[in-house]
């Protein structure tokens, strides 16, 4: 016989279970204010000190745990530098294991970038001096240690680079760091009851059920009314995001990995693969608070239906709540920004070689072969090649020390107005790219290319690249 009391008890228990499963930060009346990474702005050869440290930090409110980071902080400071300057880096490894560091997107030689050929042992230091020759862009630095990059990056070895040039400084774009030019480093994680990061090393992917930005869940930021610039880095190990605003208002994409688009692209959502970066402009001249979210907008009932959802689904899909304050800017109705870029002109470069790479997301093989450090892909300096990338599942791809233009996605050509220099892309079927090699690498200090899913990369879904 149906028992109403038992049925009500089950409903109450279900609700209690759902609410207890939520992190406390999501149940609080107010969100945490967004943590802005410290800014290290270097001029005229001022050195940049980066110590790799074990630090204490509360990923979950009230639960301080050991994580990794730089200069005593979880995650790293944002390094800001201008084209034409030199970056005098000073790394020191205070961690108990060796680490290989690299700067994804930075255009420099293999010897100066570091990478897999430069293992920084415990207590060891390394001080490369890197000339900055590229156009304005957003890059990021993280661990690339062979077979250990996912774990080390997941623990907190990640940070942002901002490169400015004359065009970006005179563009009129929002540029006040942490005020209307906001750095956002996205990670998904799993935590145990003590708030410690959970990591399973023998998997080909890691999908956390909790979304962090700059080391916080679902934070807010107060911003002045007007246009706000978001610099996004997907530092997740495997997850790609489809980002949108919860009120479906338009956004403007102005830059990708390696720099500006020819003109701003108006869109309502954008996909961000692991390692990929994007710069968005949001119009906050009018209206109230708005949330940047990953995936579709959710209602309150999702708290309960999520009990039966995929265990990899994010508990809260809020990236950031933007809270505008003050009066609207008198310059609020600015024209659609346009930028000078040589990207489109390079579509007609002479192609010296064509290659095909197929990535197996189940086995980690590239072109049906496991990783072998003796197997090297050789390219000639100052040439352009056409690469066709395919995979048997959705996978992020990235290349170090070089840059590329996307010619087509699944045999559909990319509009010239959307052409921009890149170093990371999502493969969901087939992608055809033009790769330009402007910097040297060697057998001792090679570049890497392959899976941007660091779990899969640690399984060997990568290749070494020597440019001479």
Swiss-Prot record:
Its main location: periplasm. One of its GO terms (biological process) is FtsZ-dependent cytokinesis. CDD domains: CuRO_2_CueO_FtsP, CuRO_3_CueO_FtsP. Predicted to be exported by the Tat system. The position of the signal peptide cleavage has not been experimentally proven. Residues 1-33 form the signal peptide. GO terms for molecular function: copper ion binding. It is found in: Periplasm. The keyword Cell division applies. Keywords: Cell cycle, Cell division, Periplasm, Signal. Pfam families: Cu-oxidase_3 (PF07732). It comes from the Bacteria. GO terms for cellular component: cell division site; outer membrane-bounded periplasmic space. PANTHER family: BILIRUBIN OXIDASE, CUPREDOXIN SUPERFAMILY PROTEIN. Cell division protein that is required for growth during stress conditions. May be involved in protecting or stabilizing the divisomal assembly under conditions of stress. Belongs to the FtsP family. This is Cell division protein FtsP. It comes from Pasteurella multocida (strain Pm70). The gene is ftsP.
């Amino acid at each position: 016989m149906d028992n109403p009391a038992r049925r009500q008890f089950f409903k109450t228990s279900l609700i209690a279970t759902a609410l207890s499963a939520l992190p406390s930060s999501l149940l609080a009346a107010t969100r945490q204010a967004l943590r802005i990474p410290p800014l290290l702005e270097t001029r005229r050869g001022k050195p940049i000190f980066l110590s790799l440290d074990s630090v204490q930090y509360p990923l979950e409110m009230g639960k301080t745990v050991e994580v990794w980071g730089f200069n005593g902080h979880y995650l790293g400071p944002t390094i800001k530098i201008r084209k034409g300057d030199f970056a005098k880096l000073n790394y020191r490894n205070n961690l108990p294991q060796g680490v290989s560091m690299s700067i994804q997107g930075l255009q420099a030689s293999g010897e100066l970038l570091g990478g897999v050929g430069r293992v920084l042992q415990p207590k060891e230091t390394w001080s490369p001096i890197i000339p900055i020759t590229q156009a304005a862009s957003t890059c990021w630095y993280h661990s690339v240690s062979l077979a250990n990059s996912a774990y080390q990056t997941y623990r907190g070895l990640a940070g942002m680079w901002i490169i400015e040039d004359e065009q970006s400084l005179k563009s009129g774009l929002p540029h006040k760091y942490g005020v209307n030019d906001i750095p956002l480093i996205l990670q998904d994680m799993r935590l145990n009851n003590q708030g410690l990061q959970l990591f399973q090393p023998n998997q080909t992917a890691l999908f956390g059920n909790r979304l962090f930005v700059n080391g916080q869940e679902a934070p807010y930021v107060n911003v002045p009314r007007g246009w706000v610039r978001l610099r996004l880095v997907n530092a997740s190990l495997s997850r790609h995001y489809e980002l949108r605003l919860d009120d479906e208002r338009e956004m403007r994409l102005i830059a990708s990995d390696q720099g500006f688009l020819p003109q701003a692209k108006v869109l309502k959502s954008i996909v961000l693969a692991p390692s990929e970066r994007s710069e968005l402009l949001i119009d906050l001249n009018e209206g109230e608070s708005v949330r940047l979210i990953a995936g579709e907008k959710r209602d309150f009932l999702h708290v309960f239906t999520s009990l039966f959802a995929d265990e990899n689904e994010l508990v809260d899909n809020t990236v950031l709540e933007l809270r505008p304050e003050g009066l609207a800017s008198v310059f609020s109705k600015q024209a659609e920004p346009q930028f000078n870029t040589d990207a489109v002109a390079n579509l007609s470069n002479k192609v010296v070689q064509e290659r095909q790479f197929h990535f197996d997301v189940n086995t980690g093989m590239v072109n049906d072969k496991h990783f072998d450090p003796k197997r090297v892909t050789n390219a000639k300096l100052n040439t352009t090649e056409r690469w066709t990338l395919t995979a048997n599942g959705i996978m992020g791809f990235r290349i170090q020390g070089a840059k590329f233009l996307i010619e087509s996605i699944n045999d559909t050509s990319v509009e010239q107005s959307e052409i921009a220099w890149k170093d990371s892309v999502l493969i969901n079927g087939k992608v055809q790219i033009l790769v330009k090699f402007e910097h040297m690498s060697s057998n001792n200090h090679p570049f890497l290319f392959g899976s941007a899913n660091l779990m899969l990369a640690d399984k060997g879904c990568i290749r070494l690249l020597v440019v001479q």
